[in-house]
């Protein structure tokens, strides 16, 4: 009865001759869409109507945002015009039955559209359907061709330099983005204080200096609101024209000083990372078998890669852009699955025996085959450093079971793990464990990066000479020129203590207190300027 009533409420002009009706809708991937089912899509000359059925807990609420839009095969967007059965941006409380139906009416998509997306918005919890198509249409999606751009990963790209990101926010209003934009330093061994930021001027412009060591595909982050994807290299100048819409962003246009540009098509691909979402299934690591682990990993990888193939086809990405897109997806899955492997093996092996005589037997001969999941990402590709997740991947490798077991083995016997020889033994055991798991003879880029990043965690009580010996040993394992330079830079940086913090008092507090009071609750960037010809800072 409700479905009939809603159909009667729809304007008669929506259903005319020549309309195209899709049922049996399938999606390549959906997110935050549990309990929501797209029953029918009608394409006509005047509108596109999407009919939903929803199942949820009785008296709970659902919501659909007015930012919802459809995106067709050519990435043209069609905004929602109205809803029937609920009000956009308002909570709809489910009836006692836990079932409801409603329709969304969009601007008309071409009637020959065979596959499309429906996106509620950029919010983390907003519903998204990618690659919607009628099951009968048999949409064929080619596997994307991948290729590493030799020029982009050339040695001259791995150099210290500054990128400049300039922006103009059209429709800027004070308070947009909290008046600040920032970027996170995701290079190996980076510290939080090395991030860069810039204030947005009253006219909506900003200029951010970004120290780099290689190209990066990352995000410019306003103080609030959606992030802005960017691709920059050392020495690049990237100009952005950002069209604001309320507190959000409607469009971003890019202009790069580099002859190859900034891969604007790639930046406009809003591809979500696909995860197995095992965290939502309780403590499954206690009973999960290896076979189930690999089946989960395979399914997640296939779904993620298939989604990337779709976006490569939809946006016409180059083989190099396709490689970056898929690599980001693969790194994200590998990070997530190695955490699951950690939990599984920790649950299986438990705690080490209290009797030291039994510990060596406890740590030797363990099955680390779950960590072959590392091979699901490009392990010997320097362009992995361009992806922000790579630093997280390398940092978390120290928590892998073979890494912690190697640390324990190195601490046994007459060798002191905290001394130079103990550190060398631990490095050797860890590298051999990784090579064994990955089935490689050489030391791939991923493992070399892990050795470099470990410099950040050298014990504080080591003497300068001891630190130097350990770094020399690790540097001898490296073949990548950038990583060879990087390990010595990190060794120098981390040999220095962190900057001390000083309580504001006296004249400094007197100067800053009015600023703190005026901008309370907002980000404030303060620059201390040294007067010319003055010895006082």
What is each model feature region?
Residues 1-21:
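Bacterial Sec-dependent N-terminal signal peptides
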Residues 17-143:
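Conserved functional micro-motifs across diverse proteins
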Residues 27-30, 126, 130-164, 175, ...:
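Phosphate/pyrophosphate-recognition segments in soluble nucleotide-handling domains
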Residues 117-121, 221, 344:
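"Short basic amphipathic alpha-helical interaction patches in structured regions
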Residues 133-319:
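A non-transmembrane, solvent-exposed segment enriched in polar/low-complexity residues
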Residues 244-536:
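Oxidative protein folding and maturation machinery
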């Amino acid at each position: 009865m409700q479905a009939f009533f809603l159909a009667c409420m729809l304007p008669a002009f929506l259903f005319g001759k020549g309309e195209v009706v899709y049922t049996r809708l399938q999606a390549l991937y959906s997110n935050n869409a549990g309990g929501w089912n797209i029953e029918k899509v009608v394409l006509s000359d005047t509108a596109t109507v999407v009919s939903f059925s929803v199942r949820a807990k009785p008296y709970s609420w659902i919501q659909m945002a007015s930012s919802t839009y459809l995106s067709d095969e050519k990435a043209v967007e069609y905004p929602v015009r109205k809803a029937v059965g609920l009000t956009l941006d308002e909570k709809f409380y489910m009836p006692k039955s836990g079932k409801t139906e409603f329709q969304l009416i969009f601007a008309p998509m071409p009637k020959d559209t065979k596959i499309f997306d429906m996106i509620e918005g950029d919010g983390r919890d907003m519903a998204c359907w990618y690659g919607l198509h009628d099951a009968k249409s048999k949409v064929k999606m080619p596997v994307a061709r991948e290729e590493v751009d030799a020029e982009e990963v050339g040695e001259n790209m791995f150099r210290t330099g500054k990128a400049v990101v300039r922006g103009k926010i059209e429709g800027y209003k004070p308070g947009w983005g909290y008046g600040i934009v920032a970027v996170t330093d995701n290079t190996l061994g980076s510290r939080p204080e090395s991030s860069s930021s810039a204030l947005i001027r009253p006219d909506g412009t900003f200029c951010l200096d970004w120290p780099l060591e290689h190209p990066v595909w990352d995000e410019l982050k306003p103080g609030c609101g959606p992030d802005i994807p960017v691709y920059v290299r050392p020495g690049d100048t990237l100009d952005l024209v950002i069209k604001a819409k309320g507190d959000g962003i409607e469009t971003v246009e890019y202009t790069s000083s580099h002859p190859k540009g900034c891969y604007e098509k790639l930046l406009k691909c809003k591809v979500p990372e696909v995860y197995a979402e095992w965290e939502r299934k309780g403590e499954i690591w206690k009973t999960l078998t290896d076979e189930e682990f690999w089946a989960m990993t395979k399914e997640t990888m296939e779904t993620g890669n298939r989604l990337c193939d779709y976006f490569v086809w939809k946006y016409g990405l180059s083989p190099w852009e396709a490689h970056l897109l898929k690599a980001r997806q693969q790194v994200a899955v590998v990070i997530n699955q190695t955490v699951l492997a950690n939990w599984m093996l920790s649950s299986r092996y438990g705690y080490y025996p209290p009797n030291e005589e039994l510990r060596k037997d406890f740590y030797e001969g363990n099955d680390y085959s779950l960590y072959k999941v590392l091979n699901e990402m490009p392990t010997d590709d320097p362009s992995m450093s361009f992806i922000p997740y790579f630093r997280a991947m390398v940092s978390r490798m120290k928590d892998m079971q073979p890494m912690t077991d190697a640390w324990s083995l190195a601490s046994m016997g007459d060798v002191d793990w905290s001394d130079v020889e103990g550190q060398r033994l631990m490095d050797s055991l860890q590298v051999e464990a990784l090579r064994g798991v990955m089935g490689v003879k050489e030391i791939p880029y991923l493992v070399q990066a892990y050795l470099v990043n470990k410099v950040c965690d050298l014990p504080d009580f080591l003497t300068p000479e001891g630190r130097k010996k350990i770094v020399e040993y690790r540097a001898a394992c490296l073949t990548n020129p950038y990583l060879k330079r990087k390990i010595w830079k990190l060794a120098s940086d981390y040999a220095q203590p962190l900057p001390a913090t000083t309580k504001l008092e006296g004249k400094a507090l007197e100067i800053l207190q009015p600023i703190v009071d005026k901008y309370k609750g907002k980000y404030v960037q303060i620059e201390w300027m040294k007067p010319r010809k003055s010895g006082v800072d």
